Amino acid sequence: MAQDDEDVGLALGLSLGSGGHRRQRESRDEAPSSAAASLLTLRLPAESGGQPQVVVKREVVRAEEEEYEYEYERALYSSSAAAADDDEGCNSRKKLRLSKEQSALLEDRFKEHSTLNPKQKVALAKQLNLRPRQVEVWFQNRRARTKLKQTEVDCELLKRCCETLTEENRRLHRELQQLRALTHSTAAGFFMATTLPVPAATLSICPSCERLATAAAAGASPTAAADRTNKPTAPHLFSPFAKSAAC
């Protein structure tokens, strides 16, 4: 069995030659082993007397050439696509130069409709001699600028409202502090006035008032006098510092 393997290797080297053997080695290093094995066919012809002969087909070299061409085409396509993308990016980054008539027409259309459907976009692009994509980008930028301006106006209005409310809050806080201080002082004075006792020595009955009350009771009718006698009379209190006119 070992002798047969050596014969197979010797026959392979003789059939390919030095150049073919080198080419096969390079192809085996680059191509997968499964693909190379599938392209190699071993045949045992009957007339050879049982001696194995290896026939290497040209599909190996042809497959390598096709694979190389495919890789080259793919690399070429990738480079061309990248260059096209770069050109498109450069063109898109260029600022659109519009004439006064074009700008005026775009502004009028924007005032009528802030957004355009595809048909309106194409018609306006033809009228302005522009591409539909350029018209779409202009409308997008115009909407963004309008929204930014409205946001700035709203921010300024809210800022003023915030300042007004802050000042009103401070004023109300000062008024609240003043009311609290006034309420505290009033409550303290009322508490002092109600809690201080009145000395009993300062209260006395005026003698003249008592005499007048007795004379009025004597000159009244008996029933009225009886009613007065039945009802207790409240004592008249006066201050010793205030003298009566009768006294």
UniProtKB/Swiss-Prot annotation:
Keyword Transcription regulation: yes
PROSITE patterns found in the cross-reference section: HOMEOBOX_1 (PS00027), HOMEOBOX_2 (PS50071)
Region of interest (Leucine-zipper), ranges: 149-193
Function: Probable transcription factor.
Keywords: DNA-binding, Homeobox, Nucleus, Transcription, Transcription regulation
DNA-binding region, residues: 91-150
Residue spans of biased composition, Low complexity class: 32-44
Pfam families: HALZ, Homeodomain
Region ranges (Disordered): 1-44, 221-247
GO MF assignments: DNA-binding transcription factor activity, RNA polymerase II-specific; sequence-specific DNA binding
PANTHER family membership: HOMEOBOX-LEUCINE ZIPPER PROTEIN HAT14 (PTHR45714), HOMEOBOX-LEUCINE ZIPPER PROTEIN HOX15 (PTHR45714:SF25)
InterPro entries: HD, HD-ZIP_Homeobox_LZ_Class_II, Homeobox_CS, Homeodomain-like_sf, Leu_zip_homeo
Official protein name in the record: Homeobox-leucine zipper protein HOX15
Localization: Nucleus
Highest rank taxon of the organism: Eukaryota
Similarity remark: Belongs to the HD-ZIP homeobox family. Class II subfamily.
GO cellular component terms given for this protein: nucleus
Gene3D superfamilies: Homeodomain-like
Tissue expression summary: Expressed in seedlings, stems, leaf blades and panicles.
Source taxonomy: Eukaryota, Viridiplantae, Streptophyta, Embryophyta, Tracheophyta
